[in-house]
């Protein structure tokens, strides 16, 4: 008997949702950084064994939106509640429950689907603090289970996976066993470039960046995958920061991104990056759609 099911990973920004998904999948399919709102699109991670398939849906961190892009991200996250049988509500062990958590809890109560509370980053707290955190969240709503984990170190992750597989119902294998995500390579390439911008820049720059892969094809002469990508920003000052003195920052972004892209593709890569200004793109629906943030996603 084959079992399958869809599981959403929900929570505030920076609680470790993407770190968890990458750990489960055994490779990077969702980019990570210490900046809030790193994940902007829903990303499927397809976990398949001989007897079961769990389709995880990593979602953007739920926050109070200030732009049309923010609206898109929050609606995209909540839309998964219509697509799944179980929700992993992830919270950090080293932070107290806040208004953002309470807002999510109200939506989860209304959704009326099983919710597992996943308390991440247990490596950062004393066990007594963890018990207080569990009691506090349990006072707010009824959870199917509570599972403390460290996504970074992998502590207790197998326990969570076993809990999910034990509760799967008989179903189809929705995706081939060798498919690990629903997104095409172009999307993953653009995300890997954006991740390097997030790591290397500060303040408003990371939130103002989108990456569009203009072309991606193999050059038969050099046997390399030739990629042309444009980094979009909202202001000339941001363009200057990303290019850097004599192009040094852009070169660094390209070099770091190329390494990750080569690992993913298993091929040598020639990466060309450009920077363009598109004023206030985060508040323009047409620009959002052009850059891959399309309302059709929810």
Curated annotation (Swiss-Prot):
Q: Give every KH type-2 domain span.
A: 201-279
Region G3, annotated ranges: 58-61
The UniProt keyword set, sorted, is: Cell membrane, Cytoplasm, GTP-binding, Membrane, Nucleotide-binding, Ribosome biogenesis, RNA-binding, rRNA-binding
Q: Where is this region: G1?
A: 11-18
Q: Which InterPro entries match?
A: G_ERA_dom, GTP-bd, GTPase_Era-like, KH_dom-like_a/b, KH_dom_type_2, KH_sf_prok-type, P-loop_NTPase, Small_GTP-bd
Q: Does the keyword Transport apply?
A: no
Q: Which SUPFAM superfamilies match?
A: P-loop containing nucleoside triphosphate hydrolases, Prokaryotic type KH domain (KH-domain type II)
Q: Which residues form the Era-type G domain?
A: 3-170
Sequence segments annotated as region (G5) = 149-151
Q: Which GO terms describe its molecular function?
A: GTP binding; GTPase activity; ribosomal small subunit binding; small ribosomal subunit rRNA binding
- One GO cellular component from the entry? plasma membrane
What residue spans carry the region label G4? 120-123
Biological process (GO) annotations held by this record are: ribosomal small subunit assembly
The yes or no answer to whether the keyword GTP-binding is present is yes
Give positions of region: G2.
37-41
Subcellular localization: Cytoplasm; Cell membrane
Q: Which PANTHER family match?
A: GTPASE ERA (PTHR42698), GTPASE ERA, MITOCHONDRIAL (PTHR42698:SF1)
Q: How does it assemble?
A: Monomer.
Family, per the entry? Belongs to the TRAFAC class TrmE-Era-EngA-EngB-Septin-like GTPase superfamily. Era GTPase family.
The name on file for this protein is GTPase Era
Protein source organism: Streptococcus pyogenes serotype M4 (strain MGAS10750)
